[in-house]
Amino acid sequence: MLLFNETKKVTRQQGWCLTGPPVEEGEWSIRLLAGTLSGLWYDVQVPGSRSLMLNGTGIITMNWGRGTAYQVKFDALDKHYTAVYPEAGRYDLLIKGEVHLITEFDSLASDSLKGEIKAFRNLTALEVLHLAGSWVTGDIAALPASLLQLSLQETLVHGDLAAIGRFPLLKKIDLTGTLVEGYSGTLLPLWANGIELKFRDLHLSAGDIDELLHDLAATTTENGKLDIGGLNGRRTSNSNLAFTALAARGWTIICVVGHATFGSADISFGDANARFEEEAA
């Protein structure tokens, strides 16, 4: 087997994991391990390096789209993996092997990473996914249910916000500025106390906000934080009881509480920008 932390270039059979003791000729025996992460690529406009931070266990083969690949053995530590792209172009990222043992994937805020988030469907142990600032697309419902932390702010992902109900282990999520289309309502999981939910600038309607507050109040989670400020609707009196119940359980809720346009009677005094005011409960 590979030595601890050892990497080894593989042959043209890219995506194949090499394992077992070396034979007399110095070659490695080959086996195909189940699982693939494909469908992501780097759109390199300015030549230079691109990096990922990964964590997990097991063995994978990484192909950065430059015609070569290398093997990595994880040891449950956060590590950076880097490729240098000397020319502009599209470079497909392919990871094969024991991808079901990857626990963290961080694009390190690269704005040249593109592709569909369904690429992560085989990463069934994935706990932390940071893709903020990238150009990834796709429905958030396609992500694995194992997630603890999810950062997709300012990406092109979409879907019903009710998909958050698919993540029972969630502790922190940020979907700010994405293309998520409303909230249809769902039975939310019993999340751990202290969960952080950030859904700013999603253009949620007043009805969406009210329903989300009702569904959160129906859980027993305490001391959470919900940020639904920015470019979202203003909650109505229909959610007053839910709002009060959450505040009594220690929740901090940041939401739009007043709208104003010049010449409108609906101005909330003290609003510095004459557009909206936010409150924390």
Q: Positions of the model-derived regions?
A:
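Eukaryotic tandem repeat interaction scaffolds
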Residues: S151-L187
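N-terminal capping/linker segments that flank leucine-rich repeat
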Residues: L2-V136, I140, A145, L161, ...
